[in-house]
Amino acid sequence: MITANEIRRRFLEFYKAHGHEAVRSSSLVPKDDPSLLFTNAGMVQFKKIFLGQEKRAYSRATTSQKCLRVGGKHNDLENVGRTARHHTFFEMLGNFSFGDYFKEDAIKFAWKFLTEELKLPKERLYATVFRDDDEAEQLWLKHSDIPAERIYRMGEKDNFWSMGDTGPCGPCSEILIDQGEHMTCGPDCGIGKCDCDRFLEIWNLVFMQYDQDATGKREPLPKPSIDTGMGLERITAVCQGVFSNFDTDIFQAIIQYTCGLANVSYRSDDETDTALRVIADHSRAIAFMITDGILPSNEGRGYVLRRLIRRAYRFGRLIGLTDTFLHKTALKVVDIMGDDYPELRENSDFMARVVREEEDRFNRTLDKGLSMLEDELATLSASGAARVPGDIAFRLYDTFGFPLDIVNDIAEKRGFSVDEDGFKALMKEQKERAKAAWKGSGEKDIASRFQPLLEEGMRSEFIGYDHLCGEGRIVALMDEHALAVERLAAGQKGYLVTNRTPFYGASGGQSGDIGTIASPSGKVRVVDTIKPSPELVVHHVEAVEGDILLDQEVDLTVTEDDRVASARNHTCTHLLHAALRRVLGDHVKQAGSLVAPDRLRFDFTHIAPMTPEELAAVEREVNRVIMADIPLETDHMHYDDAVKRGAMALFGEKYGDEVRVVAIADESVELCGGTHLRATGQAGLFLIVSESGVAAGVRRIEALTGWNAMHAVLAQRSEQAQLSAMLKARPGEIVSRVESLQKENRTLRKDMERAAAQATSGQGRNIMDEATDVAGVKLLAAKVEVPNVKALRDLMDDVRSKLVSGIACLAAVDGDKVQLIIAVSKDLQTRFTAPQLIKDVAAEVGGSGGGRPDMAQAGGTNPAGIDAAFAKLRSLIGG
């Protein structure tokens, strides 16, 4: 039986033999494409090439691209595990032509690979073409053994592809395989007639031959291109002769491993099988997402990861996995796929820790969610309701990850139904909000503003690695709205592009340069430099003298102090990264950075907050390398050679075949396009000013270098002197003096709490005499004097210990505010609950509140309404 790994290998080798460059899979996090949450197709990493914004050294490529589809039109998450072919993570095999070959070779290659390499039976293969694509049909007849009766013409919905409302588009041709008559869905079964699995699409060939404008008009592209995609999981199922992708070797190893953990059997019952398939699918997605730098959070990509972990964990509970297990199945993915994706092995320990921590967190969350649901059901029962409102079900789902079916199950056992329509309406609102919020960063807007320049093939030669000034010619001039102009006059703002520039455009976390550009007739101040594409640098300018004109020769000068300050911070960012890995471990990876002239910010993967000792060790390591004054070396080389040299490739970054390597002896080797010092000693000093958490598994260090670090040290010394004066202690005695004051403060606080407790206890004994009978219910409603809210709660606890059956309400005034607490004994909770009562009672004092069925608390702003509140409580009890 041919394995999935063998199919992947044969595919890439086949296209390499036909002149294609085998390109590495890009990250699941799209680089420079804020329109996408995840990489969801093989062509994503080549999008700028298809749009004419980028050029590569090759004109044909082949990839096995890792993809994730869990959002937008591809959001079929609830179907994963329930069908044979829905997945979150999958691999897309593809071949691409960038103005090289077109339809004929695309069809020839596909037919040859399927029938000669994979040896699929020719008599079972079919093709579809776009209804108007006579050329594609003739090419299939010419280069394959598919007869005319097995070639189907389809409409635009099925066989026409576009990148968006505008841009490259074209017809496509799908290859299908007949899986046999036993798969027939009925008398109307057939291609284009039904969606059953008899005629299974295995490969889609897209012929990009038009450029569509905003009106829908299509013009032929000067260089038509090819984009094809074939799902590895699907073609593996076909080659291995199994109906479901989950029955292939891709998934079976994970499924059987999970069976061993849960002591269950696959193919025993539908519920168990679904759970096993979900766990296998999600384990793959989770392992690759974390490896590509995505970490659990409550927004964006991190929220998707958290949902997948919780969904898989919940399905594990359904088959008896009550302990954490998902980190183990994710490690099984590493065992299976680590040879083809080495990054999985490199990050396996960290990945497993992140998953384990998220499992533990979800365990605690589930307990809280169950408690909340029980409280809500008790409140509903007391009020006589028989239906769980949709907002409660939604809150449980949104806050605790409780799927609707769990709420349904628990509610049904207690005799309740659930408002599913209300739940779905709130879910729809949330999705619409999320869709509106996901507009990405400003990168997309910046790139689109300068799209005309990119389409014209405009490029800038960057000379800033070696020079801070230089000469160039203005090749594009725009006003502040990025509209083409012939000149900028003094006081006007706009954008300027030169054929050569020493200005570094913001990228890789480093801020853009500032400076001046002068011509014989005028001068502009460069307030920022941006980089809408790898080969185009745009200066954001403000004219300060005379006029600056299109096509003028100009002198460009970068502000040296800011450039050098940025270089200090960028070099120290590399040193910090290396130091963190030495002190904390190799699991540390860069998760984001900011390099500005005045500071650096570095986000990195690490589970726990750093200790003071660890921070001090990292700071010492960086300063050790600074004081060693080690020269920096830069070199350009092939990506694979750089990796062999040990260069660090960063999460989420997209690298071309040739990369720039920045090396600091044996201390640090990274792929980097930024500007740096010539030697580490130029950094002067490195000072960490803060360490904090920014997301689950991601920490952040902010630091200063050079003069900024020196100024911070001087400021700290000044503050130390002030503290010494205030505490009447020498600098070396400050800590012991503060500790002494803290101890004294704790003693005084305990004395105050003891006095308050004594007063509270005394009130508790006395106010019990104020209890009255209201409609057969013992009611205590009393206004009390206490020092704080904690004392009020303590007093209520004292009252509850003496009130065997009844309702108590205590009110305390603090200035213009009032606090209320209501307690209901257990025997009365079928008639009254504390949250029910306090809602109406608190309204009398201008407040609101909530709590558990046995006790609820509220705050108000109208102390004068306390008597009315007590009266309201009596009326509620008396009916």
From Swiss-Prot:
SMART domains recorded: tRNA_SAD
Cofactor note: Binds 1 zinc ion per subunit.
EC numbers on record: 6.1.1.7
InterPro entries: aa-tRNA-synth_II/BPL/LPL (IPR045864), Ala-tRNA-lgiase_IIc (IPR002318), Ala-tRNA-ligase_IIc_anticod-bd (IPR018162), Ala-tRNA-synth_IIc_core (IPR018165), Ala-tRNA-synth_IIc_N (IPR018164), Ala-tRNA_ligase (IPR050058), Ala_tRNA_ligase_euk/bac (IPR023033), DHHA1_dom (IPR003156)
Keyword Protein biosynthesis: yes
One GO molecular-function entry: aminoacyl-tRNA deacylase activity
Cofactor(s) essential for the protein: Zn(2+)
Broad EC category: ligase
Cell compartments where the protein resides: Cytoplasm
The keyword ATP-binding is assigned to this record: yes
GO biological process: alanyl-tRNA aminoacylation; negative regulation of DNA-templated transcription
Keywords from the named record: Aminoacyl-tRNA synthetase, ATP-binding, Cytoplasm, Ligase, Metal-binding, Nucleotide-binding, Protein biosynthesis, RNA-binding, tRNA-binding, Zinc
Pfam families: DHHA1 (PF02272), tRNA-synt_2c (PF01411), tRNA_SAD (PF07973)
Cellular-component GO terms for this entry: cytosol
Protein family (similarity comment): Belongs to the class-II aminoacyl-tRNA synthetase family.
Entry domain remark: Consists of three domains; the N-terminal catalytic domain, the editing domain and the C-terminal C-Ala domain. The editing domain removes incorrectly charged amino acids, while the C-Ala domain, along with tRNA(Ala), serves as a bridge to cooperatively bring together the editing and aminoacylation centers thus stimulating deacylation of misacylated tRNAs.
Name the UniProt record assigns to this protein: Alanine--tRNA ligase
Source organism per UniProt: Nitratidesulfovibrio vulgaris (strain DP4) (Desulfovibrio vulgaris)
